[in-house]
């Protein structure tokens, strides 16, 4: 009976570690996606280190869980006491680190305010300057989503650097201009009328809602995965210790 129980724990340990392996791969994938996001949202909040820190934590935790899941599977199948003990201690450290990352993600979500984005835009935006990463990223977002500013075109009335560079000749940047719906090259309806602030030729929608939804998509996804991985890790630690004690006896 004791042998059957030990064998059952061994295979349960293997199953849990296989799920940890998959969870680590998912977290690793999300972390990579955040870092190489083609729409460039990362650069918009580059002044806030929480997003970058969170992405690196996802990468680190995903990579560790990926390797640790493989290690746990080997320890369970081979019934190696050293591997099991190392697995237990290591996964305990990761468990505590992930709790810290969850708190960090919660704090970061609170910083995604309309006021924060508006402040960053009015302070740093430089118009069509492609050499400035912040401005180029904002231009990419506004063109991609057909929006203008954080709240709307009126944001650029208070963008000090933009107003200085354009000598107040343009009401809005070119990225705010509406484009021909059927045009693959993004031909503007009327650049001149748009830059003069004519409503018919510029996008009136602010980008805040679009950006917030995009961030919340992978924040919630990462949070759901983290909760699932934490639960699996907890059971894996229990099975690892039970299997370790069973091997000793």
UniProtKB/Swiss-Prot annotation:
Name of the featured protein: Tetraspanin-18
Chain ranges on the Extracellular side, renumbered to this chain: 35-49, 105-223
CC per GO annotation: plasma membrane
Subcellular localization: Membrane
Superkingdom of source: Eukaryota
Keywords noted in UniProt: Glycoprotein, Membrane, Transmembrane, Transmembrane helix
An annotated GO BP: regulation of sprouting angiogenesis
Residue ranges of the TM segments: 14-34, 50-70, 84-104, 224-244
Its job: Plays a role in the cell surface localization of ORAI1 and may participate in the regulation of Ca(2+) signaling and the VWF release in response to inflammatory stimuli.
Assembly notes: Interacts with ORAI1; this interaction regulates ORAI1 exit from the endoplasmic (ER), and/or Golgi, and trafficking to the cell surface.
Entry membrane topology: Multi-pass membrane protein
Cytoplasmic side: 1-13, 71-83, 245-249
Sugar-modified residues: 111, 129
CDD domains (alphabetical): uroplakin_I_like_LEL
Organism name: Bos taurus (Bovine)
Family listed: Belongs to the tetraspanin (TM4SF) family.
């Amino acid at each position: 009976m004791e042998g059957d129980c030990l064998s059952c724990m061994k295979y349960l340990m293997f199953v849990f570690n296989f799920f940890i392996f998959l969870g680590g791969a998912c977290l690793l994938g999300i972390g990579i996606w955040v870092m190489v996001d083609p729409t460039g949202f990362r650069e918009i909040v580059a002044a806030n280190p929480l997003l970058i820190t969170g992405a690196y934590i996802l990468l680190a935790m995903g990579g560790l869980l990926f390797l640790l899941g493989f290690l746990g599977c080997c320890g369970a199948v081979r019934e190696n006491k050293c591997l099991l003990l190392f697995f237990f201690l290591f996964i305990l450290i990761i468990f505590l680190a992930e709790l810290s990352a969850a708190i960090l993600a919660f704090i970061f979500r609170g910083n995604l305010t309309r006021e924060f984005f508006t402040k960053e835009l009015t302070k740093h935006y430089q118009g069509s300057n492609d050499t400035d990463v912040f401005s180029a990223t904002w231009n990419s977002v506004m063109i991609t989503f057909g929006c203008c500013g954080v709240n709307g075109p009126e944001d650029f009335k208070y963008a000090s650097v933009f107003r200085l560079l354009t000598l107040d000749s343009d009401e809005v940047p070119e990225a705010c201009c509406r484009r021909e719906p059927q045009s693959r090259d993004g031909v503007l309806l009327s650049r001149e009328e748009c830059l003069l602030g004519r409503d018919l030729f510029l996008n009136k929608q602010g980008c805040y809602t679009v950006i917030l939804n995009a961030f919340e998509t992978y924040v919630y996804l990462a949070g759901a995965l983290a909760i699932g991985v934490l639960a699996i890790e907890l059971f894996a630690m229990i099975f690892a210790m039970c299997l370790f004690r069973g091997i000793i006896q």
